[in-house]
Amino acid sequence: MDHKMSMYLFVSYLAIFTLFFKGFVSSFPSGYNNGYNNGHGHGLTSNLNYRFYDRSCPRLQTIVKSGVWRAFKDDSRIAASLLRLHFHDCFVNGCDGSILLNDSEDFKGEKNAQPNRNSVRGFEVIEDIKSDIESSCPLTVSCADIVALAAREAVVLTGGPFWPVPLGRRDSLTASEQAANTNLPSPFEALENITAKFVTLGLDLKDVVVLSGAHTIGFAQCFVIKHRLFNFKGSGQPDPNLAASSALLSKLKDTCPNVDSSDSKLAALDAASSVKFDNAYYVNLMNNIGLLDSDQTLMTDPTAAALVKSYSENPYLFSRDFAVSMVKMGNIGVMTGSDGVIRGKCGFPG
């Protein structure tokens, strides 16, 4: 390939990337501080900025990426865990790293709340990344920002979209087991209740549908789904929708036999591609084989069902909207400036 042709291809690729990036940025709400202007936006937006650590910790994103990659090589399921960790952090008093705090004399933390106990994981991965960052940039980067970046890297590693993460969050000094029990959606909840919890935090029904798509790489403990396998609505029979797919039902029953000892075993929410971030979750919902009650209930609302159909048919649309909703979620209740602290270790407030 001669020099002129190489330059032509380079310019063409650059133009395509520029058009894509402009389209991605324009997807954010009007007034959003996208890091290329000085506005602070409105609603969920804040004083976060994509370039917050460019001078104070220039290797930050490389360190986080390396830490997530090391963990992923040993355990591919950690990708889903890191993504869930960010969600569970943000939904309890904001994206402040509170989920990472151990219990203390002053408070009972979120780790042992009902939705998190023996379920949420990835704490050691975040702590290891924090240790590496402290070696380069002592007391500079918040644990809350590390969680947000790790969630993004987890999605990218499994084939999902990349999105710029606004940074500058500060860490909380406390955590609340009670708030976690109250604020986090349950897999058994009705769509109306789940949506109400999202709306309280400034999100909406579309965000419910989009962020539920994270279940494409998710897992559930067997006790959450066994009623659909063996005794749906007290019938003593499987859910007819799952029974219609005999191969899937058989596989799920093998994974989650009808004995108490299987309650803590794990079943993939997207069995066909459990380590690939794709739109198969929505295809499953269209086929009435979403495993969680809170998943399949999306099809009971016309607006939500229409979004599910769109995402099942258009993976690019899902990827774009997922990135936008993740940034929205990552702005919930953030502390910036002199509020909060920068923890030296993520499990301890001081």
Curated annotation (Swiss-Prot):
Disulfide bond positions: C57-C137, C90-C95, C143-C346, C222-C256
UniProt-listed InterPro entries: Haem_peroxidase, Haem_peroxidase_sf, Peroxidase_pln, Peroxidases_AS, Peroxidases_heam-ligand_BS, Secretory_peroxidase
Main location group: secreted
EC number, UniProt record: 1.11.1.7
Calcium recorded as keyword: yes
Cofactor dependence: heme b; Ca(2+)
Keyword terms: Calcium, Disulfide bond, Glycoprotein, Heme, Hydrogen peroxide, Iron, Metal-binding, Oxidoreductase, Peroxidase, Secreted, Signal
Tissue specificity annotation: Expressed in the whole plant, with the highest expression in roots.
GO terms, biological process: hydrogen peroxide catabolic process; response to oxidative stress
This protein's GO CC annotations: extracellular region
Record-listed substrate binding positions: P185
Misc note: There are 73 peroxidase genes in A.thaliana.
Purpose of the protein: Removal of H(2)O(2), oxidation of toxic reductants, biosynthesis and degradation of lignin, suberization, auxin catabolism, response to environmental stresses such as wounding, pathogen attack and oxidative stress. These functions might be dependent on each isozyme/isoform in each plant tissue.
Full protein name: Peroxidase 10
Organism: Arabidopsis thaliana
